[in-house]
Amino acid sequence: MAISVGDTAPDFTLKTQDEQEWKLSDHQGKNVVLLWYPLDWSPTCEGENCKISAEPLPGGDTVVVGISRDSTWSHKAWKASKGIKHDLLADPMLEVTKKFGLEHPAVPFISHRATVVVDKSGKVAYCGVQESTGDERDWGPIHEALGKLG
C-alpha cells in the first residue's frame, strides 16, 4: 500500500547520477517532489523529466528529484543526453520504492509512475500513482499541492 497524505515520509539515502549521496532529511525546510518513473530512456519518462526541467514546479523552496531502478551510470548518461536539470536517484533494488509502497505489482522489477510531495516538515502533502506506466502523470494536483504549501 502506498504512503498516505499526512504520513511522515520515510527518510532514505540514495546515490545521484554523480555518485553523491542524496538524503531526504537533508532537505527538511524545503518542499521536496519525489518523481518515481519506471525506466530511463523510455518515451514517457523522458517527456516528463524534460518537461520538469523546462517548466519548473511552483515554489522557490522546492527540490525535485527523479527516482528509478536504473543505475547511476544510466542516469548520468540520460541526464546529460536529454538536458535534465534535476538530480536522478538510483534505487536499483527498489528498497526506497518499497518503503513508500510504490513497487509495481504486475511488473515487480520497476516502480509505479508516482509522485510524492514532502512538505518542509517531512510530512507527505500529496501522493499520486499512475496505474498505467505508459500514461504521463497528472501535473495539476502536484501544482495544487505545492501552491497550498507555499
Question: What are these model-derived regions, one by one?
Answer:
Residues M1-G150:
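Chalcogenol-based redox active-site neighborhoods
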